[in-house]
Structure formats: C-alpha cells, structure tokens
C-alpha cells in the first residue's frame, strides 16, 4: 500500500473553544500516538484529509508531514478513528496511529464480495458471515481490501478463510476453517413448494 501525504501542524492549545475555532477555519483537531511515540496534538485541514481519503478502503496509510513551529518531521500512520458529525457529515476529530515501516503490525482487512452467485437463481440464500480478517504484515504490504469472486457459488457452497489467496508476506490470525460467505438452502421454502405440488 502506498502512503498518502497529509500536512499537519502541532497544536499548542487545547480545549473546546479552540477546537470550535479550528473547525470554523476548516481545520479539525487530531492526535498522533503509537508505540515509541509520545502523543502529539495536531490540526489538519479537513479538505486535505477528505482528498487523502478519496477512494480509499478501511485501511489508509497516511504519511503525515508535521510542522512544529517551522521544524518539519514525517510520520507514517494509519487512521485508527475518524469522528464525523452526524448532522453535517463533516469531519470532527481524527486519531492517527504511528507505524514503523520496517516492523509488522496487526490490521483488520475488509473483504469485498463480487458477483451474483448461481445458487441465488436456484432459490438459495446468500449469507455473509464475516466481512474482515485480522492479519499481520509490514505496512507497505497491507492491502486496501481482499476481493472474492462469489459468482460460481451454488447452493451449499461456501468460501472459507483458507480459500483466500494471500501474499506470503501476510500472516492471517483467523482460523482457515472460518466461513466467510455461504449459499444456504431455504428448506422452509422448498418444503412449502413440495406441499403445494402434492396438493395440486
């Protein structure tokens, strides 16, 4: 995964009033923290953050270019939490988790399912049982998501975690036997159809 750059400034002041003033100026309060990193209060441009996140999935690698009174420093990070105002849908606060590019970290990677299963046309029910997996890898090896083609799934078929094609550099913590998605037979519907045919 390629890092997306985002400018930030060290925030010297704190408090609700200062946060309100920042938001009126198009900025949002943020914090950077992580192993070996003292928590740093930041401010980032809301529009720049929106641009950095455009088209991104759950995991977004952000290279923060931090200005501390004219002294610049770079920190690779992952957005751990992004608070959004429910009424305006504007960004409210961001948490950045500092990463070391030469050290493996644990991530939750979303699963995207593509295609219309053939089992649906036969009366099966599509059931999503798990939509993400937990992995360990270097930040540069972290995928945006894992795409699974389910168009060939018939009634009774399933996709397990062990069926996923993962890079050798990615280690999955979840059991290979866990079911991600399945096409279940609707026994109740089939039974009703059989009863209807028998009575006709």
UniProtKB/Swiss-Prot annotation:
A GO term, aspect molecular function: structural constituent of ribosome
InterPro entries for this protein: Rbsml_bL25/Gln-tRNA_synth_N, Ribosomal_bL25/Gln-tRNA_synth, Ribosomal_bL25_b-dom, Ribosomal_bL25_C, Ribosomal_bL25_long, Ribosomal_L25_dom, Ribosomal_uL5_bac-type
Signal peptide: none
Disordered: annotated segments: 1-20
One cellular component (GO) term of this entry: cytosolic large ribosomal subunit
Keyword annotations of the record: Ribonucleoprotein, Ribosomal protein, RNA-binding, rRNA-binding
SUPFAM superfamilies: Ribosomal protein L25-like
One GO BP: translation
Superkingdom to which the source organism belongs: Bacteria
Functional summary from the UniProt entry: This is one of the proteins that binds to the 5S RNA in the ribosome where it forms part of the central protuberance.
Subunit structure: Part of the 50S ribosomal subunit; part of the 5S rRNA/L5/L18/L25 subcomplex. Contacts the 5S rRNA. Binds to the 5S rRNA independently of L5 and L18.
Record HAMAP family: Ribosomal_bL25_CTC
Family, per entry: Belongs to the bacterial ribosomal protein bL25 family. CTC subfamily.
Protein name: Large ribosomal subunit protein bL25
């Amino acid at each position: 995964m390629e890092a997306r750059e985002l400018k930030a400034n060290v925030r010297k002041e704190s408090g609700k009033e200062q946060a309100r003033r920042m938001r009126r100026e198009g900025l949002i309060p943020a914090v950077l923290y992580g192993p070996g990193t003292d928590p740093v209060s930041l401010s980032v441009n809301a529009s720049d953050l929106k641009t950095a996140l455009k088209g991104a999935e759950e995991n977004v690698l952000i290279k923060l270019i931090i200005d501390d009174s004219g002294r610049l420093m770079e920190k690779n990070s992952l957005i751990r939490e992004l608070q959004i105002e429910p009424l305006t849908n504007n960004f409210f606060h961001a948490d950045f988790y500092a990463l070391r590019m030469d050290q493996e970290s644990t991530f939750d990677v979303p699963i995207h399912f593509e295609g219309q299963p053939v089992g649906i046309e036969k009366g099966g029910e599509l059931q999503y049982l798990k939509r993400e997996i937990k992995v360990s890898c270097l930040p540069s090896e972290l995928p945006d998501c894992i795409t699974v083609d389910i168009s060939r799934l018939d009634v009774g078929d399933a996709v397990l975690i062990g069926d996923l094609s993962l890079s050798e550099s990615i280690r999955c913590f979840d059991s290979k036997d866990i079911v991600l998605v399945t096409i279940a037979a609707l026994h109740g519907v089939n039974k009703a159809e059989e009863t209807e045919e028998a009575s006709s």
